[in-house]
């Protein structure tokens, strides 16, 4: 609906509507495609992150839900080609809401032969699911002497698969102390279209490397895990956009109340260290950061001769910059060869 102080022609109203929608599409694609989006999902690592697994195959299925809110503010001023003396000024205020529901399927294998005294593991993360984004925008401005205000809304939904991410990790155990190094890559074969508002694929390759530590006291049942890493993003060939280098830390502390049941707290921080580059980076460096905290609960149980686990954790995000924020929840089920740890002394 257009609201103007005068009664401009229908042709002018149509032009204003097109300008608003074009601006929404331009800004929406930037926000959902590259700016504020990252290959690494903060909160990926949590309980017992660095404890070596037992040799053999394992499998996990994680349900991930996120409700994110963001905003955008753009101001432009230009002349029209056919009317060089007429200046068009537009101020766009947009509210962006995104809902994401993913199933992350992860087959894994831990090798029995030690390497440098540690256990080598391979994981393949496969995300499938749906995402929906809605953008509500209000454009205000003036076309020459005529002021206008125009409100429009667009939305997009996608049900598909994202980029698979293979990972190699090496883990060591030294009593209560456990250590890990890992390397994970993003393979850009997920569903991606640079002209869509929402995508599950990134459209570019990524490489993340990091290390982790887990302290587990079998007597007290106290456990603490921290994992930190750096992400290098390759250039998106579709948009000539390259995200900057990201640094992330996942934190978790828990207490086993019984041999099987634990409660705890989780958190993460994500910081972009270098700015975005390329001809597609029309918003400039667009350095993003965010932090989060939340609760965690988990339960271990036998599945035949295997070890099953069920965990639930949630994150409330804050201190967001150039990135949508909100709540996200992880519900994970896994089955693996029986581990010697954790065993809580009672």
PLM regions: where:
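Extracellular loop and loop/strand-boundary signature of outer-membrane beta-barrel proteins
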Residues: 46, 89-95, 149-155, 193-199, ...
């Amino acid at each position: 609906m257009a609201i103007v102080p005068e009664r401009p022609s229908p042709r002018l109203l149509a032009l204003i509507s097109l300008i608003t929608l074009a601006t929404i599409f331009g800004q929406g694609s930037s926000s959902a495609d590259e700016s504020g989006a990252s290959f690494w999902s903060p909160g990926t690592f949590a309980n017992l992150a660095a404890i070596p697994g037992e040799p053999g195959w394992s499998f996990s299925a994680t349900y991930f839900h996120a409700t994110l809110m963001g905003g955008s503010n753009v101001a432009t001023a230009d002349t029209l080609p056919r009317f060089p003396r007429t200046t068009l000024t537009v101020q766009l205020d947009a509210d962006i809401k995104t809902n994401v529901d993913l199933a992350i399927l992860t087959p894994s294998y831990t090798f029995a032969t030690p390497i440098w005294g540690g256990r080598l593991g391979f994981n393949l993360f496969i995300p499938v699911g749906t995402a929906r984004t809605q953008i509500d925008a209000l454009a205000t401005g003036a076309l020459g002497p005529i002021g206008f205000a125009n409100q429009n809304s667009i939305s997009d939904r996608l049900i598909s698969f994202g980029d698979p991410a293979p990972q190699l990790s090496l883990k060591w155990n030294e009593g209560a102390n456990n250590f890990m190094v890992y390397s994970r890559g993003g393979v850009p074969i997920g569903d991606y279209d640079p002209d869509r508002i929402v995508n599950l694929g990134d459209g570019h390759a990524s490489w993340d490397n990091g290390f982790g530590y887990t302290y587990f006291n079998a007597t007290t049942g106290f456990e603490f895990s921290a994992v930190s890493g750096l992400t290098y993003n390759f250039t998106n060939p579709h948009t000539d956009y390259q995200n900057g280098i990201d640094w992330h830390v996942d934190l978790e502390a828990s207490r086993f109340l019984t041999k099987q049941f634990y409660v705890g707290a989780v958190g993460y921080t994500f910081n972009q260290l270098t700015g975005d580059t390329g001809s597609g980076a029309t918003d400039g460096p667009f350095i993003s950061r965010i932090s989060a905290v939340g609760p965690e609960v988990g339960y271990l149980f036998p599945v035949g001769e295997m070890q099953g686990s069920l965990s639930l954790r949630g994150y409330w995000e804050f201190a967001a910059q150039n990135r949508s924020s909100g709540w996200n929840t992880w519900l994970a089920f896994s089955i693996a060869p029986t581990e010697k740890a954790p065993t809580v002394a009672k």
